[in-house]
Structures are given as C-alpha cells and as structure tokens.
Curated annotation (Swiss-Prot):
The gene is btuD. Residues 2-236 form the ABC transporter domain. Belongs to the ABC transporter superfamily. Vitamin B12 importer (TC 3.A.1.13.1) family. PROSITE patterns: ABC_TRANSPORTER_2. Pfam families: ABC_tran (PF00005). Gene3D superfamilies: P-loop containing nucleotide triphosphate hydrolases (3.40.50.300). It comes from Vibrio cholerae serotype O1 (strain ATCC 39541 / Classical Ogawa 395 / O395). This is Vitamin B12 import ATP-binding protein BtuD. InterPro entries: AAA+_ATPase (IPR003593), ABC_transporter-like_ATP-bd (IPR003439), ABC_transptr_BtuD (IPR023693), Metal_Ion_Import_ABC (IPR050153), P-loop_NTPase (IPR027417). Keywords: ATP-binding, Cell inner membrane, Cell membrane, Membrane, Nucleotide-binding, Translocase, Transport. The keyword Cell inner membrane applies.
C-alpha cells in the first residue's frame, strides 16, 4: 500500500494526500505546468518535500537511494545517456542486485518483458541506434525489470512520467498491455498521462492537478466529466457514448 499524507513541494505543489492499494493504476492528469512531474518526483524520493510518503513499510523521505531502488522504480522524461551500451546490457543493469534466482529464470523475465514491448529483436543493438519510440520501450522494460515481483519481492511501486509521450499508436497499445501485466502482479502504478481517453479506459483512480493544487480525485468516471475538464483545461470538451463506452471529444 502507498500512503501519502500532506505532501507538499514548496509553492509548486500544495498539500495533498492519497492512499493507493496494490494492483491499482493511478493516472495523474492536468495542463502543462500543473505539478504532475513534481508530484511524481516527490513520490519517488528524488526531490525534497514536506509531509510523508510511505511505500509499503518504507519512509521515502528517510530512505537511501539503494533502499528506494528496491521498493520503487521511477522513470522520468529523459534523453539517452552519453555512454555506450547495448540494449541487453542496459536491461541487465536494471535487474536488482543479489537476485536469488537461477540465471535462466532472470533471462526468462527479461525475454517476456522484451517480447511484450516488441524489443526482443533489438537486444544486441546500441541504445544510440534506437529511435525515440524504441529507446522509450527499452527504458520502460528496464523500469519493469527493476520492480518485477518475480525478481524483486520487495517492490511495491512503479512511477512513470508521461511514458506514452514518444510512442506511436501501436507502441502505446503495448504500453497498456505492460501496465496491465505489472498491476496484475500486485504493483501499484502511478503515471502522468495526457491522453484523457486512455485515462478514461484504463485508470482505476485519477488525480487532476491545476496550478499545483489537487483539483479532483476519484475514479475516472467521477473526475473526467465535461464540466470539470472544461474548467481546468479551458477548452470545449464533450463526453459521448460509443458502442457502450464513454469517449471524450475535443475542439
């Protein structure tokens, strides 16, 4: 379980609290500059904050980086590193140290996640030979290996900052299959997202931020209403039903 009590980051993010259960998928949404990345970085223990964040039994503000790495994975928006690595080397570095499994079991988990993201044919390529979408899928695979319950029983939380941003439509579908897999294994997934229709379909819980303030929180159905979204995003939005499912239309 993830417990957040009165989390605040100076004037960028005003106090908010939440409780997320194992296996839940949370989407953090809102206009650019509303505090999404700040919230995720604080949850990950990467920036100072006031209040408290508990990941399982771990107090995030008091934990070392190595302790944090055992309990959560955090994927920020980032460029490729300047050093040279092949994809399989990058993924191997993502596997937690001192894994109490046979090498074949570790290789099997790497293979399954690589196949799920359609990067299994790129394992022997340099990361600098990858397109933006390919590199993002490698990064997603690495973060999943870090907190895979098969490899790391201590892991509780997967934090992604706009993971779909560099992905095309087909690759985004792979991403949501991966999210379903990781949540199905008991991890809590908290991610920033701009595709509100994906949030409507896939999020168990939604945090809507506006100017550093938690404007709404609840299920996707409760938060993603026409009135609420129009007031925050300042644009015309319609919610319609198509084949029995809700969809958002934007001007």
């Amino acid at each position: 379980m993830i417990r957040v009590n009165s989390l605040q980051v100076d004037s960028r993010l005003l106090p908010l609290s939440l409780q997320a259960n194992a296996g839940e998928v949370w989407h953090v949404i809102g206009p650019n500059g509303c505090g999404k990345s700040t919230l995720l970085a604080a949850l990950a223990g990467m920036i100072p904050f006031s209040g408290s964040v508990q990941v399982g039994g771990l107090n995030v503000s008091q934990a070392s980086l190595s302790e944090l790495a055992r309990h959560r994975a955090y994927l920020a928006q980032n460029d490729k590193p300047s050093f040279q690595l092949h994809v399989f080397q990058y993924l191997a570095l993502s596997v937690p140290a001192n894994v109490a499994l046979e090498r074949s079991e570790v290789a099997s988990e790497i293979d399954q996640i690589s196949r799920l993201l359609n990067i299994d044919d790129k394992l022997h390529r340099s990361i600098h030979q990858l397109s933006g979408g390919e590199w993002q899928r490698v990064r997603l695979a690495g973060s999943c290996l870090q907190v895979s319950p098969v490899l790391n029983p201590s892991a509780r939380l997967l934090i992604w900052d706009e993971p779909a941003a560099p992905l095309d439509i087909a690759q985004e579908s792979l991403l949501y299959r991966l999210i379903e897999r990781m949540a199905g294994q008991g991890l809590t997934v908290i991610m920033a997202n701009h595709d509100l229709n994906r949030t409507l379909r896939h999020a168990d819980q939604v945090l809507l931020l506006s100017r550093g303030v938690l404007y709404r929180a609840g299920s996707a159905k409760e938060v993603l209403t026409q009135e609420v979204l129009q007031s925050v995003f300042g644009t015309s939005i319609r919610r319609v039903e198509l084949e029995g499912h809700p969809h958002l239309l934007f001007d």
